[in-house]
């Protein structure tokens, strides 16, 4: 899958600089990016095979647990085009305050 935009993941990890869990969060995001980049998902069932704990919000909106569910990553997927768009990343606590179906990148 082609992921747009990796920079969002890097900036989020960088924003945690100085926190003791920052290296673990960065490693988890790098691992997610590598796995999804190699994936060739055709549908949400393919996503669930690789990420059983992922939440399928709609046919195109997926939520991934990052670093043991400490963080949430919301993406939109176009399986036909093989593209995943990063919409939002944050703590589990912040995730509880967003509308996952409507959130857009930069909000």
PLM segments and residue spans:
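Basic, Lys/Arg-enriched alpha-helical interface segments
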Residues: 1-70, 78-83, 92-107
């Amino acid at each position: 899958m082609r992921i747009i935009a990796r920079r969002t993941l890097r900036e989020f990890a960088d924003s945690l600089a100085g926190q003791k869990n920052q290296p673990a969060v960065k490693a988890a995001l790098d691992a997610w990016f590598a796995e999804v980049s190699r994936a060739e998902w055709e549908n949400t069932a393919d996503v669930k095979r690789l990420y059983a704990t992922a939440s399928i919000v709609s046919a195109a909106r997926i939520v991934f647990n990052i670093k043991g569910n400490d963080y949430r990553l919301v993406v939109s997927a176009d399986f036909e085009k093989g593209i995943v768009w990063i919409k939002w990343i944050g703590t589990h606590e912040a995730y509880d305050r967003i509308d996952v179906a409507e959130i857009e990148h930069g909000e």
